[in-house]
Amino acid sequence: MFMPAPRERGGSCFWLLDRGLGSAGVALNSAAPEGVFPLDWSVLKATHGIFFKWMAWDQVVHMSFPEFQYAFTNTFPEEEQKKYYDRYVVPETGRIYFQAAFAQLDPHHATRVNFKNNERAPLLLTAGEFDHLIPPHVARSNYEHYKQSTARTDFQEFKGRAHLLIAQKGWEEVADYVANWLEQLPIQKG
């Protein structure tokens, strides 16, 4: 994809900003890249159905509704949980789960970033207070690693929020915070 100028980025890719692809990045409840140890009880509970499935690394996996409830929407009313499960959950390669959880063991270093990259664009990392998939302490550890760079790095924890915070009631608070953060940056709009 050709883009004439760097743009703001949001999403699940570990290395876009590290490679100079973007003028700013927002990592909403970001999975931990290589160097940040993400596993704890809540993460294991949220993903056990995938990690304990035989050969899931090389298979397409499908998250069950109870796994989705616990990992993504644990603070949502059940009718919203069902709506978002039906809307967003699709079969996915098991490889991405293993690469994120066991990044230190990945010989291909799919999630490696240069935390000390001083040329990296500004980065905002967020956490949801009640996120089971990427608990706040993992998100903070991620932030502490990225702060090794002199590039602007900020962190915001949203109180009362689960992992799927952008779909949760009151999502406007998150959107407004991100928009205000972006507007404060000295970014050339191109």
Locations of the language-model features?
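Catalytic active-site module of serine/aspartate enzymes centered on a nucleophile-bearing elbow/loop
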Residues: 149-190
